[in-house]
C-alpha cells in the first residue's frame, strides 16, 4: 500500500496503539480450550475458517466439537456437508428438549469431529450467555477443543458466543471496512475480559498488495496490534470446497496448507508463515506457461 494511504488509515483507526500480545512460547495450551471465531463484519470467511480450523484440529487427533451460534441463520452445517443429518439443535439442548449428545452430529469422515448445529427458526434471544456457558462447561469434560462460530454483529449472538470462551480468533480481510469492524470487536473482547485474541488475515492477494491496491499483512497487523496466527490466500478452491461441504484444510492447496498451519499454531507449534508472494508467483508462472501452449 502506498505510504500516504497507509498513514491515513493508521490515523483513521486510532491515535494510540494497543499493546501487542506476545506469541505463545511454544508450549502446548491447556486442554480443554474454547475458541470463538469472530469478526464483527459478515462475509469475511468466518464460518469457513471455523469449519477448517475444527476439521484441522480433528485431523491432528484432537477431539473437537464445532458449535454454530448463529441462531436463525445457520450455515456451518452446510459448509461441513452435514445439513441433512440434523435432528436436534443448540436451542433444543439449552431448553432441555434433548441431551447435548443427542444433538451432536458425528462427522463420518473424521472420527474426532462433531457438530452442534444452530436452530433455523428461532431468534438469537432463545439462548442466554449463562445457558451457553453452562453448556460449554459440560462439553469441556469431553472435548479437547470447542470451536464457536460467532454470528456477525455485536448483539445477543456475539454475547452468547464469547460466553465461556478462553480465546478468540479474529478473522478479517484486507479491506478498510472489515478491519474497522475487527478493531471494534477486539475492543469488545478486551472489555469482556477475553484477553487472548489472535488474528487471521483472510483472502490476501499478493498481486494486489504489490500494486498498492490492497493492504499487506503487515499493514493489517500494524493497525490491529494483536498476534497474527495465520494468513489465508484468496483461493478459488475455498469456494469449491465450501460448495461441496468438504473443508480443504491439510490438502495440497495453499489455502489448505495455511489453515493446517493455523491449527498447529493453536496447538502451540512454532510454524513459520507461508511465503504467499513466492508461492503465488510460482503458480502464476506455471499457469502462464500452460495457458500459452
Predicted regions and their residues:
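Walker A/P-loop NTP-binding active-site region of P-loop NTPases
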Residues: 34-98
